[in-house]
């Protein structure tokens, strides 16, 4: 699907933001980190967040933490839940591996959202070839506040 979120297609952004089940890759347990602040805001707005973080020993924002995106997607699927959007807070050079991991799962989430400052052309091309909607270099919190 070819959505023009880059040039202010608010109807597309609004459509994407209707998906309330998110996996957040790189969600830090540290409240001073941007990923934590954005996730807390989204949770307050009614989104169901699934944290993906290397240390899964303690919940983040009251939610079970998964070490990998695949572990989260598989566990949620077994429980009859679907993650529709993967939100990424990782360095651009790490994004391709996250995209590849996501595509190894079934069902594949519908949207891959790279937060502000994050772009990866190779990951974008790979995901779009599989029908995934890709958003780059946009803050989900900011986009949500613009519309709601």
Placement of each model-derived feature along the sequence:
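Short, acidic/turn-prone active-site loops that include or flank metal/cofactor-
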Residues: 54-55, 71, 115-119, 138-142
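NAD(P)-binding Rossmann-fold cofactor-contacting core
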Residues: 32-33, 40-61
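Conserved beta-strand elements of the Class I
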Residues: 23-25
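Short N-terminal or domain-adjacent regulatory/targeting segments
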Residues: 1-18
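Active-site capping/gating segments
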Residues: 131-148
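ADP-ribose/adenylate-binding Rossmann-like module
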Residues: 103-127
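Structural motif
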Residues: 21, 84-85
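Glycine-rich, highly charged phosphate/nucleotide-binding loops
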Residues: 3-8, 60-81, 87-99
């Amino acid at each position: 699907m070819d959505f023009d979120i880059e040039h202010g297609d608010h109807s597309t952004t609004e459509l994407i933001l209707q998906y309330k089940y998110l996996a957040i890759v790189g969600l830090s347990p540290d409240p001073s980190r941007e990923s934590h602040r954005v996730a807390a805001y989204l949770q307050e707005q009614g989104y169901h967040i699934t944290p993906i973080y290397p240390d899964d020993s303690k919940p983040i924002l009251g939610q079970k933490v998964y070490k990998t995106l695949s572990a989260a997607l598989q566990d949620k699927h077994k429980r009859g839940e679907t993650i529709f959007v993967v939100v990424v807070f990782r360095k651009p050079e790490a994004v391709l591996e996250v995209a590849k991991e996501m595509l190894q799962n079934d069902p594949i989430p519908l949207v891959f959202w790279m937060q502000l400052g994050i772009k990866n052309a190779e990951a974008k091309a790979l995901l779009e070839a599989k029908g995934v909607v890709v958003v780059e270099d946009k803050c989900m919190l900011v986009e949500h506040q613009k519309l709601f």
